[in-house]
């Protein structure tokens, strides 16, 4: 009874939206999809018990870490392995029992729990699947208005994005008890199937503000561990030698791989959202970190097939490795999973090293090509005075933030066209894997300031927000009064929560595309346009004309 509507590539038909057959458009089977719904339900139950325990002074950091991590496994293109999802469900049930036992030992009578608590799906795959109808994310759809269902899903998917960033922050040593409590509160509340429009809209904004705090934690974790990114020239063509490709967002894994490949003759390349790592001072101590290979996630079946070495997926996004016949040399980490692919636990990457040494590696040097990255928060703040002077002098007319998630729809050419057509006296900021639509093009500079400023990973929207705040302070105006336009490409749940963060902070007149999320009804989209000025993209030419005429 699969139903999944969380990503941009979901099925859209006149009869309704969402993947609801044997397999989703992402390659996720109905079995895995249903098990993920069971997992979400179990995690919401666990969150309710976490809140009850907190009321009596019982705080468990391990459980606070587990819930968002396991929730992360249900994001688009993260974990396709049913057995791993079953194991997460069982862990959730075990953690719940720990809390029940601890409260019983305190002779505490727990009351006021949501009806969903006490969920008992069993510990085996078939038993858990039997609960699919009870746990479906669109349960009760025939009894509630489609706008209510759309807002429930907006909150659920936004919270998934926040959970992913919480896990990224945790890996870097950043946990916050108040953030965890707010996360559990929203998880538990969503399990009650709320049906009041205003409360759901309020929750969506609360998720956005929660995520702002999480992005701040993640920024602190990355800069504490690796220093502040700095403008850096990065090679994007390979050199001869054995090789490992590291994709995803987890820079701690990249660090471990670099340590364990030192002196082996293996070259390490970043891929996708790992590209920004090359701008951090810490990683410049490793001469065998030679550059970035490939582009965004949707091209991996071709790029990984052509890569003559081992591949490590540290987080999203993974797609079917059997298509390119490289499943025997790709490895998954943390929450990532694909059936039949080797999953690595712990910090030992010797299997990856051995695989890389057994493969041919690159035989020839390709023509050098470099791009510039590293314009995250600190670099932007250092450049801000010069930028402000050029705005005052009339040399810079507008700022565009063009980025987000990439994808394979032809309509995404819009973002390439938009960047190329932007006025020559404008600056282009970009982040996320959406940057690959244009980050190898030469946009020139304005008085020594590159017109294209790569801010970093999708979560580095935090850096862009800090720049906007600095500019608004310098020009003594609100952020919405700046000559600044945000044009965001969305694909999955991280992009959803970043959008919620921007809206919760009061940022207006954002354009997003190439299509609207399928779970948002026309009425909800109208409300978002009326309240926030949120618009869908049309054509690059028409949108630019409208923006510049305002």
Curated annotation (Swiss-Prot):
Its EC number is 1.7.99.1. Keywords: 2Fe-2S, Cytoplasm, Iron, Iron-sulfur, Metal-binding, Oxidoreductase. It is found in: Cytoplasm. Hybrid [4Fe-2O-2S] cluster binds at residues 249, 273, 317, 405, 433, 458, 492, 494. Signal peptide: none annotated. One of its GO terms (molecular function) is hydroxylamine reductase activity. Its main location: cytoplasm. It is an enzyme of class 1 (oxidoreductase). Gene3D superfamilies: 1.20.1270.20, 3.40.50.2030. It catalyses: A + NH4(+) + H2O = hydroxylamine + AH2 + H(+). One of its GO terms (cellular component) is cytoplasm. [2Fe-2S] cluster binds at residues 4, 7, 19, 26. Coiled coil: none annotated. One of its GO terms (biological process) is response to hydrogen peroxide. The modification Cysteine persulfide is found at residue 405. Binds 1 [2Fe-2S] cluster. Binds 1 hybrid [4Fe-2O-2S] cluster. Its cofactor is [2Fe-2S] cluster; hybrid [4Fe-2O-2S] cluster. Belongs to the HCP family. PANTHER family: HYDROXYLAMINE REDUCTASE. Catalyzes the reduction of hydroxylamine to form NH(3) and H(2)O. This is Hydroxylamine reductase. The gene is hcp.
């Amino acid at each position: 009874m699969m139903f999944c509507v969380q990503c941009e590539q979901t099925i859209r038909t006149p009869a309704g939206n969402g993947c609801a057959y044997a397999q989703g458009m992402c390659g996720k089977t109905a079995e895995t999809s249903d098990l993920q719904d069971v997992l979400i339900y179990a995690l919401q139950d666990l969150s309710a018990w976490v809140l009850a325990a907190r009321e009596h002074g019982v705080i468990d950091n391990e459980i606070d870490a587990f819930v968002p991590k396991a929730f992360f496994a249900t994001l688009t293109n993260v974990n396709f392995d049913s057995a791993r999802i079953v194991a997460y469900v069982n862990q959730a049930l075990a953690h719940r029992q720990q809390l029940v036992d601890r409260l019983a030992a305190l002779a505490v009578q727990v009351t006021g729990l949501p009806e969903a608590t006490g969920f008992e799906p069993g510990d085996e795959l078939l038993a858990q699947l039997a609960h699919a109808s009870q746990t479906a994310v669109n349960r009760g759809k025939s009894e509630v208005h489609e706008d209510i269902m759309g807002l429930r899903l907006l909150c659920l998917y936004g919270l998934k994005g926040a959970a992913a960033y919480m896990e990224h922050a945790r890996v870097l040593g950043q946990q916050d008890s108040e953030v965890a409590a707010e996360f559990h509160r929203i998880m538990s509340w969503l399990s009650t199937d709320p049906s009041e429009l205003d409360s759901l809209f309020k929750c969506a904004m609360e998720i956005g503000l929660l995520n702002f705090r999480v992005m701040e934690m993640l920024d602190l974790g990355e800069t504490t561990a690796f220093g502040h990114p700095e403008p850096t020239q990065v090679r994007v063509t390979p050199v001869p030698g054995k090789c490992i490709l590291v994709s995803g967002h987890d820079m701690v894994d990249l660090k471990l791989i670099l340590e364990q490949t030192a002196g082996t003759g293996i070259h390490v390349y970043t891929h996708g959202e790992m590209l920004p790592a090359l701008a951090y001072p810490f990683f410049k101590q490793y001469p065998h970190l030679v550059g970035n290979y490939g582009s965004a996630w949707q091209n991996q079946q071709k790029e990984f097939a052509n890569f003559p070495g081992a591949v490590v997926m540290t987080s999203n996004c993974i797609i079917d490795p059997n298509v390119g016949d490289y499943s025997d040399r790709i490895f998954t980490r943390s929450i990532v999973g694909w059936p039949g692919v080797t999953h690595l636990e712990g910090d030992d990457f010797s299997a990856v090293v051995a695989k890389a040494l057994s493969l041919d590696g690159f035989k020839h040097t390709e023509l050098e090509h470099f791009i510039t990255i590293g314009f995250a928060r600190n670099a932007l703040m250092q450049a801000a005075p010069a930028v402000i002077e050029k705005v005052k002098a009339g040399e810079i007319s507008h700022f565009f933030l063009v980025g987000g998630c990439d994808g394979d729809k032809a309509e995404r050419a819009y973002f390439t066209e938009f960047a190329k057509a932007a006025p020559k006296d404008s600056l282009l900021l970009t982040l996320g894997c959406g940057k690959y639509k244009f980050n190898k093009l030469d946009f020139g500079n304005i008085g020594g300031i590159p017109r294209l400023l790569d801010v970093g990973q999708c979560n580095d929207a935090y850096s862009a927000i800090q720049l906007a705040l600095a500019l608004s302070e310098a020009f003594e105006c609100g952020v919405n009064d700046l000559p600044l336009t945000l044009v965001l490409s969305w694909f999955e749940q991280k992009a959803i929560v970043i959008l919620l963060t921007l809206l919760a902070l009061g940022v207006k007149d954002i354009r997003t595309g190439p299509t609207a999320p399928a779970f948002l009804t026309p009425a909800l989209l109208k409300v978002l346009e009326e309240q926030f000025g949120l618009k869908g993209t049309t054509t690059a030419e028409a949108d630019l004309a409208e923006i510049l005429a305002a």
